UniProtKB/Swiss-Prot annotation:
Function statement: Involved in the import of queuosine (Q) precursors, required for Q precursor salvage. Transports 7-cyano-7-deazaguanine (preQ(0)) and 7-aminomethyl-7-deazaguanine (preQ(1)), with a preference for preQ(0).
Topological region Cytoplasmic: 1-12, 56-70, 119-143, 206-221
Periplasmic face of the membrane: 34, 92-97, 165-184
Location (main, coarse): membrane
Example of a GO biological process term: pyrimidine-containing compound transmembrane transport
PANTHER family cross-referenced by the UniProt entry: QUEUOSINE PRECURSOR TRANSPORTER, QUEUOSINE PRECURSOR TRANSPORTER-RELATED
Protein name according to UniProt: Queuosine precursor transporter
CC annotations in GO: plasma membrane
Compartment list: Cell inner membrane
Topology relative to the membrane: Multi-pass membrane protein
Protein's gene: yhhQ
Superkingdom to which the source organism belongs: Bacteria
MF terms (GO), sorted A to Z: transmembrane transporter activity
Length: 221
């Protein structure tokens, strides 16, 4: 783990928290939109949410687990509120107008609450697993294991809280199937696309940080 100034850590906390909020908000909207792939039911949220695990794993690798946990706790409440507002305004993928905020939407509230709980469980487990394995010589072991375990708790918690006995008949009937397919797609997407991306971004960021450290050292001398 590199040594960073307090200013660098505050900047990382701000921008990474903003990124987490963006992914959570978009995923909570996209999870309302079912899609069928090769006869299996899933949602578009399966394709956006893995970005969270990529960002978290890079944060733990470069900045350490404490900053990653600070990001998780900083994001939880704002994500809950923003997710409810966005999902209410664009309920079932259609613009509802600002008048939709005047009425409590139980379906959207369940999605926002489920996202709150699932995000906390999934990310805390992801940080814990990754932090335990990040010293391994196999660079791919920590992100792979943390993705597998983090996504299990995240997916099960989210779909159970959001869609068990949901007012949406389709989601209430198919939530277990969708959760299983969603998990499989998340893992597949993460391993095929995000794991190589993790390796590339890690090397790029470490090189950039090393170059900046050398420049700062030269300027100081």
């Amino acid at each position: 783990m590199n040594v960073f100034s307090q200013t660098q850590r505050y900047k990382a906390l701000f921008w990474l928290s903003l990124f987490h909020l963006l992914v959570i908000t978009s995923s909570n909207y996209l999870v309302q939109l079912p899609v069928s792939i090769l006869g299996f039911h899933t949602t578009w949220g399966a394709f956006s949410f893995p970005f969270i695990f990529l960002a978290t794993d890079l944060t733990v690798r470069i900045f350490g687990a404490p900053l990653a946990r600070r990001i998780i706790f900083a994001v939880m409440i704002p994500a809950l509120l923003i997710s409810y507002v966005i999902s209410s305004l664009f309920y079932m993928g259609s613009w509802q107008g600002f008048g939709a905020l005047a009425h409590f939407n139980l379906f959207v509230a369940r999605i926002a609450t489920a996202s709150f709980m699932a995000y906390a469980l999934g990310q805390i487990l992801d940080v814990h697993v990754f932090n335990r394995l990040r010293q391994s010589r196999r660079w791919w072991l920590a992100p792979t294991a943390s993705t597998l375990f983090g996504n299990v708790s995240d997916t099960l918690a989210f779909f159970f809280i959001a869609f068990w006995r949901s007012p949406d008949a389709f989601m209430a009937e198919h939530w277990m199937e969708i959760a299983l397919v969603d998990y499989c797609f998340k893992v597949l997407i993460s391993i095929v696309f995000f794991l190589p991306m993790y390796g590339v971004l890690l090397n790029m960021l470490l090189k950039r940080l090393a170059d900046k450290s050398e420049i700062n050292a030269l300027q100081a001398s």
